[in-house]
Design a protein with these regions (language model features):
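Accessory alpha-helical/coil subdomains and C-terminal extensions
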Residues: 1-16, 21, 31-36
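Short alpha-helical segments enriched in small residues
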Residues: 31-215
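Short beta-strand-to-loop capping motifs
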Residues: 22-26
Length: 215
């Protein structure tokens, strides 16, 4: 970055990710692209799997295209996001081809009765935990009869946080043909910031699970 002239490279801090922006100046689009290509290759080589996606296409569109390409389906189980993951998925026209539906399991009772999360698991670990996030995802996959499923459970605030489980803590579960995994995030911002960031992260974790075969 220190030695750059044309093209230029900028790192932009966004909610939940860092955007790498390459800008080239040339007389034609084709000439600009020729300047960009070598740097694009260098950045992709150095960052490897840490590269998320092309930001000119939304995460929900990227995930939708991936699901359509492999003829797969997805369902959701949401607690703290209370439907925002499903909303993002259905922002895409034609999403009914792959999104089968979701369960908003805001209460522990619904987590247990509808998604099949064991009551002793809820009592032992609490709703905001790795174990429950995984069980929620597995339950959603069974209910929706889908290829994949994703869950969210967290503390969006402003109240409800503790030293052990602070406001902003969110657990995600993703399940599919490669088993079940969980991801933990400590998000910042107000209640809506945390919920929106969690919904967007949920889609990202499904995308990486699919493209990296269960990670």
């Amino acid at each position: 970055i220190k030695k750059q002239a044309n093209p230029t490279i900028a790192l932009l801090i966004k909610k939940g990710y860092i955007e790498v922006r390459i800008t080239a100046k040339a007389e034609t689009l084709e000439a600009a692209q020729e300047l960009l290509n070598p740097w694009d290759a260098i950045i992709r080589e150095r960052l490897g799997s840490r590269i998320g996606r092309d930001l000119t296409i939304s995460m929900e569109e990227t995930l939708g295209r991936t699901l359509l390409k492999e003829h797969s389906t997805i369902s959701t189980a949401e607690s703290c996001t209370s439907g925002l993951v499903g909303k993002l998925l259905t922002n895409v026209s034609g999403s009914s081809e792959y999104y089968m539906g979701g369960v908003i399991s805001y209460s522990n009772d619904v987590k247990h009765r509808v998604l099949g999360v064991p009551q002793d698991m809820l009592d032992t670990y609490g709703a905001v935990s790795e174990q429950v996030a995984k069980a929620m995802a597995e339950g959603a996959r069974i209910v929706g009869q889908t290829t994949y499923a994703v869950s969210t459970t967290g503390i969006a605030g402003p109240g409800g946080g503790t030293l052990e489980k602070p406001v902003g803590l969110v657990w995600f579960g993703v399940t599919g043909p490669h088993g079940t995994v969980a991801h933990k995030a400590n998000l910042i911002g107000n209640r809506e910031d945390i919920r929106q960031s969690a919904a967007e992260l949920a889609l990202y974790y499904v995308y990486t699970y699919i493209t990296e075969k269960g990670k």
